[in-house]
């Protein structure tokens, strides 16, 4: 395989990167972006800096690191990450992460990797998010590659899945880069982090004759990200509520609204746990399984690591006790923390055209389900 086989989905090459930097620097939205990332510098200075970047690494080390710093300073009280000692800076991994926030799950991991001597990863970039040229340019200059969402005919879905599988294997084995991908299509809305069996099946499509080798060669590393205050918790509650009555249809601009809400909403403490990579030894124990059973078993391996590594906060224990009418976890939070959480729950009362008790139960479930999954 050659990189040109993936021109339709890959990130920008060096020449395309230079052209994109010029477009970003001269876009109509640049003054707004500049003011957020570099509030104390003039637009002219920042425009010149962006236009002069020569490599992705320069862009990520300077501007994207600054973006993450601003997010952390403005909306996170404490950011931590652990588990990097399980990996080698020279290794090429497939980071499979739970997915709670459209942008920050992957972006905060890149920030941590960069600050600890690891190269950043390529990142999956949903085609549905490619709403304009500026977003495409920023994404593809950050090593993002396009992933088509399910839809169309079965034949087309198979073709795009096989193409994605080929690309993932090419990046890790031949290009010598790592990749970040979510454990499922779309974000977790209800607090249950579960790996989609179809994702594992897709990984195996590019090595159909040896299911053990297919997974082992990708060097899968499960990742768990935990937010003290769930990203877009009210928006997720409303979406889950609407889904109770009819198939949910996204509204125009909804993804962008979720991205902006996720960036700006107070998140409290945020922790990323990099789990032990999957080993060939544990995969060999699954050798006698059928392909379908194997895909399910590998997904369970990831779920076990991610759920075990997920960091619980007082909000999770409070929600559990409230939802199930117990005091089981009362030693894990204070009365003040409980009152703060209840104040957030009461915000749902503004949506008086909905069944408020149902809304509250959904909201509590988002926070309580990670406790159930331990």
Predicted regions and their residues:
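Residue-level preference for long, well-ordered alpha-helices that form the structural scaffold
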Residues: 56, 156-160, 291
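Long, low-complexity C-terminal extensions of enzymes
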Residues: 306-374
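Membrane-anchoring hydrophobic helices of lipid-metabolizing enzymes
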Residues: 1-93, 99-110, 114, 136, ...
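Soluble catalytic domains of membrane acyltransferases
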Residues: 67, 73-278, 345-349
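A sequence-composition feature that detects small, non-aromatic residues
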Residues: 20, 25, 35, 51, ...
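Soluble or luminal CAZymes and related metallo-dependent hydrolases
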Residues: 63, 159-164, 294, 298
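A cross-taxonomic marker for long C-terminal extensions/tails that follow the last structured domain
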Residues: 244-323
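General structural signal for secondary-structure boundaries
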Residues: 52, 56, 150, 197-203, ...
